[in-house]
Amino acid sequence: MKAFNTLLLLSALPATVITAQTASFDDVKDRELPANWTNTKTGKGEPKWTVEKDDTAQSKPNVLKQSGEATYPLCLKNDTSLEDGFVEVKFKSVSGDTDQAAGVIWRCQDADNYYVCRANALEDNVVLYKTEKGKRSSLDIVGRRGGYGVEVKVAPQTWHTLRVEFSGSRFKVLLNGKHLFDAEDATFAGAGRVGLWTKADSVVMFDDFSHGTN
């Protein structure tokens, strides 16, 4: 009877629902922007986000490509509002003289207020920032004072997977499945949009953009 009562108690507990969505961009017409996405920027310039066919696409045939130039080009997914969960994308740095950076955005309030984690193929590092009122600042790594992200090889012309898991003020950063570091910040505590990010003249391809709760 005791075991039976335990089963009844467990069955009455609310189930943890894990939801995730993935955008592969394969149902979008060539040279167009996906529906429910916004092409915007932090700062000045002219970002250019388009879906294009590419033989190296991780889920063929299409990728989402940023080929314009701006301070920080953004592509935000409008139909999202995520407080705790994850965001993940596959990316390939194609070119860029000033920068070759690819990032994911979460808890985005608008084009001037959000969190972003980016990998850089010119600097060979991964850094997590907050952008507040249009000003970007890097966050300290948990357990370390100062410094600038983590040095790690980010080969150009190669597909990588960048993922950030976030719960409350804690953020966990992974590159190609390897846990690089954690960071903490409580500037943006509520839900916000998710999206993609580049910098300056970075030409980057993105594929299999995923987000959800966990």
Where does each model-flagged region fall?
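Positively charged n-region of N-terminal signal peptides that target proteins for export
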Residues: 1-6
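Bacterial N-terminal signal peptides
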Residues: 7-16
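Extracellular carbohydrate-recognition regions
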Residues: 20-41, 207
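Ligand-recognition surfaces built from glycine- and aromatic
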Residues: 24, 188-214
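Extracellular glycan-recognition surfaces and repeat-rich motifs
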Residues: 32-63, 70-71
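Secretory/extracellular carbohydrate-interaction modules
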Residues: 66-136
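Short, aromatic/His-centered strand-loop micro-motif at the edge of beta-sheets
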Residues: 135-163
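Short, solvent-exposed beta-strand-to-loop segments that form ligand-recognition rims
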Residues: 174-193
